[in-house]
Amino acid sequence: YERMRAVESPRPFLKTFGCVNMKKILVADIDGTLLNSKKEISPVTREAILGILKEGHRVILASGRPLPGMRRFERELLLDLMGGYLVASNGAKVVDCTTGEVVYQQLLPLSVVPKIHAYAKNRGCGLITFMGDYSISAFPPDKYVTYEAKINGIQIQVHEDWPEFVNFDINKCIVTAEPELAEIYEKELQRLLRDEANVFRSDPFFIEVVPKGVDKALTLERLLPLIGAEH
C-alpha cells in the first residue's frame, strides 16, 4: 500500500488513498455519505463496495457514531469476513473488523465523569456514554437519547449511580438538550472541560464530549502506517 494525496473516487461516497496499479485504501463516512435518506446502504452502493473488497483493496468506515452503531454496516459489507477497519467516535477508537482488535484509541479522563453528570443534572439534560452494545444513560431517557439509541440500533440502560458505574474506558459522552439550550450549554461545557476534553455539537440537540485532540483525519494519519500504508 502506498499513501498518496486523497482524491475523489469514481464512486462519489469514497475517498481513495493510493495510485494506479497499487492497492488502495478507501475511506467512507457513514451518515450523509454511505447511507441514503432512509439511513440504509443501497444495493448499488453495497455491490460497489463488495467489488472493491474483492479486488483486494481495503475499506475503512469512519464515523462520529459509537462503535456499536457501526457494527450493522460492518456486517452488511462483510468487513468482518473480508477485512476492513472501523474508525468510531470521531476517531477516538479504531477496530480491526476481522480480529476485533482495538488497534488505536483515545480515552476521556474519568475525572470528567462526575463533572459532566453534575452539570447535566443541574441543567436537566440527558446524558449517555457507551459500554459494549448499550447506551448507558444517567437519567430516564429523553426523546434525543431515545433517538440516538434507535439510529445506532442499541438498547438503553439507565444507571442512577452513573458517576460510580462509569468506571470503565470511555471514548465519548453525549449531553442532550433542546437546540436553543444546547447552543448555550455547549459553550458552558467547553469552559468547564477546557483542560480535559473537546466539546462540540454534532447535531443541534447533541453535545459531544470527546478526548482532547480527537479528529477523524488525524486518526487516519495514525492508522495508515499501522496497516502497511506508507507516508
Regions from the PLM with identified roles:
Residues 43-144:
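Active-site phosphate-binding/coordination module
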